[in-house]
Structures are given as structure tokens and as C-alpha cells.
Regions:
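Charged DNA-binding/catalytic regions of mobile-element recombinases
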Residues: 1-161
Length: 161
């Protein structure tokens, strides 16, 4: 919970696109919050953060310089939750590499292989993918543990002492 990244990507569906906001913990690579909507706006981003904040909050929240992340509503929401906002340099996608890499995996392993008919179908599939990713997929960078195995025990460390 030291640093998280947040970003938005497009998801193709039968009649257009949906937008997926995802939040990832840098240490564990756990997806700690997400939201999908057919409208690209700040409300969707804040809803993803509210889901993540229901479990915990980071010290730092990194994003790109997209209009949702520079909006006064977003800036105020992050500040009100006691979180330091961090932003990538202009056109520096690698600054947010954790979430960009997760989006790549999600798209090539799920979204590009399935043509969703509607938002309900997409939301269900995304939920299954996130669950599998967090709780079943082992990562070599995590000593072959799942993101959830690294994230949830790490949350308890300040309370153990």
C-alpha cells in the first residue's frame, strides 16, 4: 500500500467500446480496484478508487496526465483521502508500467479473445479475469506467489508489531 497506479483503457464490444479503470498495487501487482463503464468520465475513476479504498489506501497514487486524473473532482478526492498524487511525465507511459503491463495481459488474454455483447457481459468477464489474476496466477517476480498472497499479508504488517 505504499504506491498504487491507476489508468483507463478501452475495451471493444460488439457495438462500440467500454472503458476500464484499474488500480494496481506496485509491490504485489494486485488489482485492488476496478470499474467498467460506457462513459469515459471522472465518476468512473472515483468509483474504482472507492472500491479499492474500502480495503486500504496507498501513500502515493500514480497516474498519467489524462483529463480524468487532472480534474478538480479527482484531485480533491485523492487529497481528501490523505493520499499524495503523482503523475507521469508527459508521454512517458513507462512511468506507469505496472498498470500498463496488466492492461496488456488483460487485453491479450481476455478482451481481444472475446467480443462482449454488452456491459453486463464484459463486467462479469473482467471480474473473473481479475479474480484469477489476483488469486490463482503466480508471478516469477513475486517468488511464484500470487498477487493476493503478497498483498493481503503485507497489509497486516503495521498491525503485527
Amino acid at each position: 500500500n505504499q504506491a498504487w497506479s491507476i489508468d483507463i483503457t478501452y475495451i471493444p464490444i460488439r457495438h462500440g467500446f467500454l472503458y476500464l479503470t484499474a488500480v494496481i498495487d506496485w509491490y504485489s501487482r494486485c488489482i485492488v480496484g476496478w470499474e467498467v463503464d460506457d462513459t469515459l468520465d471522472t465518476r468512473m475513476v472515483i468509483n474504482a478508487l472507492k472500491k479499492a479504498f474500502a480495503v486500504s489506501k496507498p501513500q502515493i497514487l500514480n497516474s498519467d496526465q489524462g483529463c480524468q486524473f487532472t480534474s478538480q473532482q479527482y484531485v480533491d478526492f485523492v487529497k481528501e483521502n490523505g493520499i499524495r498524487q503523482s503523475m507521469d511525465g508527459k508521454s512517458r507511459w513507462a512511468d506507469n508500467i505496472m498498470i500498463e503491463r496488466w492492461f496488456r495481459s488483460f487485453k491479450y488474454e481476455e478482451a481481444y479473445l472475446t467480443l462482449y455483447n454488452n456491459i453486463k457481459e464484459a463486467r462479469s468477464a473482467i471480474g473473473r479475469y481479475v479474480h484469477t489474476y489476483n488469486f490463482e496466477r503466480c508471478h516469477s517476480a513475486l517468488d511464484y506467489k500470487t498477487p493476493a498472497e503478497c498483498y493481503y499479508p503485507a497489509m497486516l504488517l503495521p498491525y503485527v508489531a
